[in-house]
Amino acid sequence: MRGPARPSLMERWEALGRPFPHLPRWGAALVLVLALALAVGAAVAIAPSAAGDAPAPRSIASAQSSAPAANARAKGDMALYARVAARVAAGEGYHAAALAEHRASGYPTRPFVTIRLPTLAWLQAAIGTHGVRWLALVLAAGAIAALVWRRLPLASIEERIIAAALLAAGGGAALSRLAGYDHDFIAGVLLSLALFAYRPHRWWPAFLAAAAALAVRELAAPFVLLWLAFALAGRRKGEALALAALLALFVAGLAAHARAVDVLRLPGDLASQGWNALAGYGVPLAGLLELTGLRHLPPLLAAPLAVLPLVGWAGLGGRTGLFALLWFTGLATGMALFARPANYYWVELALPAYAAGLAFAPRAIGELFGRLAARTAKQI
């Protein structure tokens, strides 16, 4: 007879609980040194921006809190998406409208990913831009409900309430009149819902949210790939098959989108500058400072604070904490490698969920110092 099945990698990880109390003294010291290095590095990286070299406002958060920023953006990406949405709502085909508006505005049309996926424009035509904004608010409320009432494992009720307030502050950006046009913001809200709504025996709500994010913004694909890796590590065959099917469907849809763009492209159309800038971690950091409430703080104070949520997620443990840690660090690394400074808004894919990690940071830091103190007391 076969003995009991060995626990999967994910089962062994989740059985560990919160990871920091299990660290040896040197491990706790290493994590604290790394956190301090990240905080100092963030302050150093943002120093040029603090001196006046800040990125041009693009975010809905910027538009919400600054009239000049809103006017600047009205001449850029959001105005372009608004014109495309209006033409689609009037009955014109999406790709014809999008390429025409890109040409008229001096935007590139090659490669095909410079043209946003049509999903959001179709949704705007169906329920209106205001409808999209209200839908984003409902989705943000769903993420908050999943966090508080469904009980995020390993977090106290006090931590969940603070995290919910941070989620509400970020999700409230949907009140901006520009929110309905922002693909990255909508995808970020959907991915936040997918992160918090996941439950091992009821994963389909999170699956639907992730699928919707993927349909809105192709940059959500790494989130789904990471989830697939987690499903495989947890030996969850049905979940893994569903995610693999979703990715296959996404690839087919992306190929159809590329074909539609190629057919309508003209010889004189502009090409993108590319996405191999190797601009470093200052890009996602600049995004966090521009797109969150940290923009109201002095940059040299805000930059180190931008790192704290990562410590909170690392200390949370469980499936949610590990997934969040890998997703956020992976997104930041991808931006550091491929994004141009003007692409700092990609960080919206991590919002508002990333900010919720700030609620978990105090206990995580306390646990690290506790490990150091426990060893010291033992030696005494």
Predicted regions and their residues:
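Transmembrane-helix signature of polytopic, membrane-embedded enzymes
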Residues: 148-172, 189
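Short acidic/glycine- and proline-prone juxtamembrane loop motifs at membrane-interface regions
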Residues: 176-184
